Design a protein with these regions (language model features):
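Short, mixed-charge, low-aromatic patches
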Residues: 1-3, 48, 143-147
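Membrane-embedded beta-barrel scaffold of Gram-negative outer-membrane proteins
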Residues: 1-33, 37-39
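Residue-level signal for pocket-adjacent positions within structured domains
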Residues: 6, 10, 25-31, 81-84, ...
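Gram-negative outer-membrane beta-barrel transporters
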Residues: 8-11, 31-125
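Outer-membrane beta-barrel translocator domains and adjoining extracellular loop/strand segments
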Residues: 14-22, 62, 66-75, 125-133, ...
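Noncatalytic linker/hinge segments flanking ATPase motor cores
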Residues: 23, 41-47, 189-193
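Short, intrinsically disordered/low-complexity patches at protein termini
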Residues: 25-27, 62, 68, 77-80, ...
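Conserved C-terminal beta-signal and adjacent last beta-strands/turns
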Residues: 84-196
Length: 196
């Protein structure tokens, strides 16, 4: 299947979380923007072949901008950020996943699943783009991460064993506040379903 969507949002009293530094200490604060406009689109694709393979992905593009012309209604001062993209918000990102299934492997009702997924995020500014020298701007960098998973389901899902490798290539990944996430990690899980 293929599906898509268009996004338009006119937000009044948009509250944005900021990251501020005073004397070497960072802290979060909140700023109210009178009006913020978001325009964008998303596309999803998914292909399945029989009951043993599927491939899919999504792409998202969002443009979130400050639309408050005055700093405060009573001040009459023009807002320096009018028309600028709201900082610290990813605006372009995508993911792709692929899964293989081997049904009735070793016994009827057992399934082996192998999966791969990839996440992409375009770089984005941590602070307002028009403030300061463009050559010294702090940006949350572009990110690409790959994950692998292997699972074995026994007796139609009553028992499940799974292993996962997150961030397979050990890339440097960051959250919205440019704080580095954990590197390559391995996980294992055993689950028993006690229902009927």
């Amino acid at each position: 299947y293929v599906e898509g969507g268009v996004i338009y949002r006119n937000t009044q009293d948009y509250i944005k979380r900021d990251l501020s530094t005073v004397g070497g200490t960072s802290y979060g604060s909140y700023t109210n923007h009178g009006r913020v406009e978001t325009k964008g689109f998303n596309v999803s694709l998914r292909y399945s072949y029989s009951n043993w393979f599927n491939l899919g992905g999504t792409f998202n593009n969002l443009d979130t901008r400050d639309k408050e012309k005055k700093r405060a209604a009573s001040s009459g001062q023009n807002a320096l950020t009018y028309g600028q993209r709201i900082p610290n918000i990813p605006y372009q990102y995508a993911n792709v996943d692929m899964n293989f299934y081997w049904h009735n492997l070793f016994a009827k009702g057992n399934t082996l699943t192998f999966g791969w997924d990839c996440f992409y995020q375009h770089d984005f500014p941590l602070y307002w783009e028009s403030f300061g020298d463009p050559s010294t701007k702090i940006r949350v960098p572009q990110q690409i991460s790959h994950n692998l998973s292997l699972g074995y389901s026994i007796r139609n899902g009553r028992y499940n064993i799974s292993f996962e490798c997150r961030n397979l290539t050990d890339e440097k990944l960051y959250d919205n506040f440019s704080l580095q996430k954990a590197g390559r990690a391995f996980y294992g899980k055993f689950r028993v379903y006690f229902g009927k």
